[in-house]
Amino acid sequence: MPAPEPTRRAKKDASASPSPAHPASRELVILTGLSGAGKGSALKAFEDLGFYAVDNLPIELVPRFAELVAQSVEITRATLVVDVREGQSLAKFPQILQEVRQTLQTTVVFLEASQAVLLRRFSETRRPHPLGREEQVVHAIADEKQRLEPLRNVADMIVDTSRFNVHELRAYIQSKFTREGNAKSMLITCMSFGYKNGVPLDADLVFDVRFLPNPHFIPQFRPLTGKDAKVVRYIRKFEQTRTFLDKVTELLLFLLPHYVHEGKSYLTVAFGCTGGQHRSVMIAEEIAKRLGKKSYRVKAEHRDMPR
């Protein structure tokens, strides 16, 4: 199935807060979302990571499944799919999720994509929408969004797969759920973006760097990016740039050990400028280098930088 890009959100209500009493070695991932958004590909990615995978388990059986995983000798990580085929039972999901979280550390991952992308995928695969052949796909998508709203509202991660292909979705799942043994195993993503394209939904921390001088208005810098040495030197020469880098680094070095202590396995720190080409790219690269020197697992991603 064609293409799936990301998003993440942590809910603060009781239904979305994993119990801290559960051992970190055991976990359940509930995979849900819109038809055509890539649940099948994501499920295979979880299987490749060693998760015990179940497709479309009835909602009423999820608490019992969680108990079996919690008691199992062989299964320590499991994922299951809940989708629109559950019908009216979907309204019960938030309550059932609270029950499951009393048994097992649980993460809800909700996959979605833009309407245009979903329509293209259904057209390319020639598969009917699960809500019916006779209904226009555009109406079926709208109906499905409404039915799945209770699940989306309690999701820990909302992943927009519009920009992903199958391989990129697989890599994204692996980057978020691969386990490492060292104390700094949390994966930190320093992401640049352009505000004109919206704030990344998977960002945990967002910094607006539009206060920095903009290289876009200097003709020789306009076709370059924040990874080019000339642009880097230009942005770095300003005192506010150096002060900002130092203060953000100091803040992150304070925050990161606390995130690790709370069991967080991934963190996305996003830096935004107008277009996502110069300032945010330079800052994301520099912060990633600084954190890497402190032995954190870190990578830089540039959502909107021209390639």
UniProtKB/Swiss-Prot annotation:
Keyword Transcription regulation: no
UniProt: ATP binding residues: G33, L34, S35, G36, A37, G38, K39, G40
Statement: the UniProt record of this protein carries the keyword GTP-binding: yes
Record's protein name: Nucleotide-binding protein ACP_0619
Protein family per UniProt: Belongs to the RapZ-like family.
Chain residues that bind GTP: D83, V84, R85, E86
Record region (Disordered): 1-23
Residue intervals passing through the bilayer: none
Assigned keywords, A-Z: ATP-binding, GTP-binding, Nucleotide-binding
GO terms for MF: ATP binding; GTP binding
InterPro entries registered for this protein in UniProt: P-loop_NTPase (IPR027417), RapZ-like (IPR005337), RapZ-like_N (IPR053930), RapZ_C (IPR053931)
Organism: Acidobacterium capsulatum (strain ATCC 51196 / DSM 11244 / BCRC 80197 / JCM 7670 / NBRC 15755 / NCIMB 13165 / 161)
Function: Displays ATPase and GTPase activities.
